[in-house]
């Protein structure tokens, strides 16, 4: 970097890439949630325990019965139901992946393979926690620590690892969906 402005400009772009990447992951999880829920709804996939206890208001049931030939109500309802949800924290991602029948632990095992499943689960959970924590610090606190208010440094390499971790999660979700589609 020849000038300090360029270095700081790069860091702002890298921070933006982090927030964008997490936003894309959240959008992806919303979209695959609709697909997976529909597969269970149609009987193409085994229903998850969380699917069986998924609450739907009677007004939506009435709408579904009145337009039995259309599935539009189903996607409209899921869009509305999930519209305020963010699936990026460990808890919300775990709940959502379990709801849609592909499971948090199997996704973490595929995304972050280690010698033992327990280590994959632990490492995957830690990675998802770190992804969400850093994204929130950037998006809501200008990448500053709660404790010190000092801005956390960021590098191009960090962003590469960060985005690679997101890609590993997405690829693992895709693989789990493909396995379900093929009844593997």
Where are these regions (language model features)?
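Conserved aromatic-histidine-acidic binding/catalytic patches
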Residues: 5, 9-21, 25, 119, ...
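Helix-loop junctions and short alpha-helical segments
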Residues: 20-21, 28-121, 128
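Conserved small/polar residues in nucleotide/adenosyl-binding loops
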Residues: 1
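Polyanionic, low-complexity intrinsically disordered segments
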Residues: 110-184
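Short, hydrophobic, well-ordered secondary-structure elements
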Residues: 10-37, 163, 167
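Alpha-helical context
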Residues: 4-16, 73, 107, 114, ...
């Amino acid at each position: 970097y020849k000038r300090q402005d360029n270095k700081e400009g790069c860091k702002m772009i890298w921070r933006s890439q982090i927030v964008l990447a997490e936003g894309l992951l959240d959008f992806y999880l919303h979209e695959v949630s609709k697909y997976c829920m529909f597969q269970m709804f149609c009987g193409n996939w085994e229903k998850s325990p969380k699917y069986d206890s998924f609450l739907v208001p009677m007004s939506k049931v009435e709408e579904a019965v009145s337009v039995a030939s259309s599935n539009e109500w189903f996607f409209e309802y899921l869009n509305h139901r999930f519209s305020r949800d963010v699936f990026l924290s460990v808890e919300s991602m775990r709940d959502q992946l379990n709801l849609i029948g592909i499971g948090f632990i199997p996704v973490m095992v595929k995304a972050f393979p280690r010698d033992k499943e327990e280590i994959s689960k632990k490492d995957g959970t830690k990675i998802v926690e770190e992804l969400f924590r850093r994204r929130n610090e950037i998006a809501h606190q200008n990448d500053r620590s709660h404790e010190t208010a000092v801005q956390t440094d960021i590098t191009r390499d960090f962003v590469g690892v960060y985005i690679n971790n997101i890609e590993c999660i997405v690829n693992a979700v895709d693989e789990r969906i493909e396995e379900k589609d093929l009844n593997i």
